[in-house]
Amino acid sequence: MLRLCPGDNLGQRSWLGSLLLRAGRVSDALSFVQAWMAPAADRGDVIRHGGTDFGKPSSEALPASREEKLSDYTEASLLYTAAITSFKLFGDCTAARQYLRIAAKLNPIILVKILARLKPPSMIDSESHEIFVLTSSLIRRP
């Protein structure tokens, strides 16, 4: 769908990274969310193939100015996916910690639910539920 509508008018980007991760495509998941967190997305530029033109993901930490910008507007689902995938690909690195810090700032209830080992809801009625359902089992896996 993102290749047909790379501007993502339907909001597919909020969950595709988590689905790629669940499918074992860790590198593609990080490449995807990094494409949507790039400065081009801030400007409203169309992301090539909606971010599904997977490349090699970066392990570099973001500059402070970029971290601040992402903290203001980005969907938490992208950042939680970035945190998990960075950790899986590169270990306990600065980028993984940075993504998690930004995600927790945007939507802290996700971490609370995961740390409390709450069972994911059977019905998704908010962004928090969506992120929790799609990523909680991935975070808990060894």
Q: Predicted regions: what is each one?
A:
Residues 47-142:
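Long, ordered, amphipathic alpha-helical scaffolds
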Residues 1-77, 86:
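Eukaryote-skewed repeat-based solenoidal scaffolds used as protein-protein interaction platforms
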